[in-house]
UniProtKB/Swiss-Prot annotation:
Keywords of the record: ATP-binding, Cell inner membrane, Cell membrane, Hydrolase, Membrane, Metal-binding, Metalloprotease, Nucleotide-binding, Protease, Transmembrane, Transmembrane helix, Zinc
Cited CDD domains: RecA-like_FtsH
GO cellular component: plasma membrane
Family to which this protein belongs: In the central section; belongs to the AAA ATPase family. In the C-terminal section; belongs to the peptidase M41 family.
Protein name: ATP-dependent zinc metalloprotease FtsH
């Protein structure tokens, strides 16, 4: 289509184009469209209100002259007034002029019983009038205000936003990024090289579709990005659009569904219609599970509008030509609840898994985020990556930002390794609360509790090494913590490793039993985690010798979320349920007895570590390494073998 020349363009369209700003030319320093709309609306209402006030004042002054009541009485006495109208609170009329029409005037009415007699004596014509108080309000305020709102709504629609009215609820609330507005490329995405490699083919198709079509190949219509929250699914989708240099249509799955029946389906049709007009382009639907949940998954209280919207999405994905250059990308962290029809070949026929990054991936992500940060010479990104297992891209970005804030709070010129350590502790354990007052008895209990965890971890062979022990309160409920860091990324755990982890979790409570002959509530979280491990060993992993290699649960867990998606479905007898309970109890009690025997034997080391904690409140680095070596040397000289592993 030929572009209109400047001469053919409507002046109103030119003006609105200036207000909107042409797509794609928003550079640094240029306000985004939403800011322009806000600024325009503020100035519009200020000027409109000033105009209304000015019109009332000016027009009132032009229509009549205000005079005092004494001057009015004098003019009545002189016979220089005519056509008086006496209202409830004022008197209006016309002054007689010798050389032209009379001037209108008004005055405040005063309670004057003699006025009517004087008017009759002077043969002045007068009448009474009852004024409606609402008429002036409507005429001078409500009507101008309604006109002002109408024009504002019209201008907002012309600027591409604002209230659209009932007739436009079916329009897709899509965020459109033009080619020049997307500055993110694959260089800004790190730690997920496998996923980037999967999507390079999509970029090549958008750049050169003929390369694939000449051999009869068909590019995937849809790409589903699956991964845990914060792994970079949205960032990766934008990077694909940035690499290909095509428009990017972004919309959340929850924005399709409304309370009005049919609105979601209309928005799906509108979204695909806009995308076809801007092809080649990318449609990105974030949180697809809000829209694409399997039909019939919740038959009681189901959502007909959501299912109707999903049906329309399925129809649209079937209806467009894959050669049109429109690629659909979506992201979810709950693929197991999506409708099977959405995942079949021909719709989302390519699934790209985005896992949590390994240590090399975390180091690469950190290098991306520290580009604008002044780092100290001793900062080791590889070491930071090693002490942040399980962190995803969003967590690492937050870590770098927190470290920079810690350094700024301490008035440093650069971010040091200590700042990164403090930031990691803050993210993992919560805000440090040195001012939380604990009495000496509580502090001693916490010290022995954490010393018990740390000492058991030092003595057992199948657990992660201890990195830091602290009795400084953090977060909402943590009065102390023992930090263990893995030496490498792990994807499997053996039975012996799980049993040793049980012993570490029980070390704090057993330490309290041995030293004080009593237990506290501080072990609540430890006991919960220990019970969960034992239950999983029996019911999910088949690690119970008594029950054998069987699984006794149908818990619909998400592979990308640390929670179950529903209640466990029980399909075993009461006798098996009793045996499961007995086996879970046995595993935990066996671990408890082993820890008790170990800490009784190493009570001297336990008391020494607790004493250090009471003095310094926190142990890490070289001092902790030295203590660990002393403990291991002591154990090497002791002929008694530390119990660990099989139960």
């Amino acid at each position: 289509m030929a572009r209109k020349s400047d001469e053919d363009t409507n002046p109103m369209d030119k003006f609105m184009d200036r207000l909107r700003g042409s797509p794609g030319d928003g550079g640094p320093g240029r306000p985004d469209p939403s800011q322009r709309k806000v600024h325009f609306s503020i100035w519009y209402f200020i000027l409109a209100l000033l105009l209304i006030v000015w019109m009332q004042t000016y027009m009132g002054e032009q229509q009549s002259e205000k005079i005092s009541y004494s001057e009015f009485k004098q003019r009545v006495h002189d016979g220089n007034v005519q056509n008086l109208v006496i209202e409830h609170d004022r008197i209006t009329g016309t002054m007689k002029e010798n050389d032209g029409p009379g001037r209108r005037f008004n005055t405040i009415r005063v309670e004057d019983p003699e006025l009517v007699k004087q008017l009759e004596a002077k043969n002045i014509r007068f009448s009474g009038d009852v004024q409606n108080p609402w008429l002036g309000l409507i005429t001078w305020w409500l009507l101008p205000f309604a006109i002002m709102i109408f024009f504002w709504s019209f201008l907002m629609r012309r600027m591409g936003g604002g209230p659209q009215g009932v007739l436009s609820v079916g329009k897709a609330r899509v965020k459109i990024f033009a080619e020049k507005e997307i500055t993110i490329t694959f260089d800004d995405v790190a730690g997920i090289d496998e996923a980037k490699g999967e999507l390079e083919e999509i970029v090549q198709f958008l750049k050169d579709p003929g390369k694939f079509q000449r051999l009869g190949g068909r590019i995937p219509k849809g790409v589903l990005l699956v991964g845990a929250p914060g792994t970079g699914k949205t960032l990766l989708a934008k990077a694909v659009a940035g690499e290909a240099g095509v428009p990017f249509f972004s919309m959340s799955g929850s924005e399709f569904v409304e309370m009005f029946v049919g609105v979601g389906a209309a928005r799906v049709r509108d979204l695909f219609g806009q995308a076809k007009d801007h092809a080649p382009c990318i449609i990105f639907i974030d949180e697809l599970d809000a829209l694409g949940k399997a039909r019939g998954l919740n038959p009681i209280g189901g959502h007909d509008e959501r299912e109707q919207t999903l049906n329309q999405l399925l129809v649209e994905m079937d209806g467009f030509d894959p050669r049109s250059g429109v690629i659909i990308m979506a992201a979810t962290n709950r693929p197991e609840i999506l409708d099977p029809a959405l995942l079949r070949p021909g719709r989302f026929d390519r699934h790209v898994a985005i896992d949590k990054p390994d240590i090399r991936g975390r180091e690469a992500i950190l290098r991306v985020h520290v580009k604008e940060v002044k780092l100290g010479s001793e900062v080791d990104l590889k070491k930071i990556a090693g002490m942040t297992p399980g962190f995803v891209g969003a967590d690492l970005a937050n870590l770098v930002n927190e470290a920079a804030l810690v350094a700024a709070r301490r008035d440093r010129d650069e971010v040091t390794m200590a700042d990164f350590q403090e930031a990691a502790d803050r993210i993992i354990g919560g805000l440090e609360k040195k001012n939380r007052a604990m009495n000496p008895k509580e502090k001693e209990i916490v010290a022995y509790h954490e010393a018990g965890h740390a000492l058991v971890a030092m003595l057992l062979p199948n657990v992660d090494p201890v990195n830091k022990v602290s009795i400084i309160p953090r977060g909402i409920a943590a009065l102390g913590y023992t930090q263990q860091l893995p030496t490498e990324d792990r994807y499997l755990m053996t039975r012996n490793e799980l049993l040793d982890r049980l012993q570490v979790l029980l070390g704090g409570r057993v330490s309290e039993e041995i030293i004080f002959g009593d237990v506290s509530t501080g072990a609540q979280n430890d006991l919960q985690r220990a019970t969960d491990i034992a239950r999983s060993m029996v019911m999910e992993y088949g690690m119970s010798e008594r029950l054998g290699p069987l699984t006794y649960t149908r818990d619909p867990r998400s592979a990308h979320l640390d929670l179950g998606l529903g209640s466990r479905e029980r399909d075993y007898s009461e006798m098996i349920a009793q045996e499961i309970d007995e086996e879970i109890t046995r595993i935990v009690e066996d671990a408890h007895e082993k820890v008790r025997a170990t800490l009784k034997r190493e009570r001297g080391c336990l008391e020494k570590l607790a004493k250090i904690l009471l003095e310094k409140e926190s142990i890490d680095g070289e001092e902790l390494k030295q203590f660990c070596q002393e403990v291991k040397s002591h154990i090497a000289r002791d002929p008694v073998q530390v119990e660990g592993g099989a139960a």
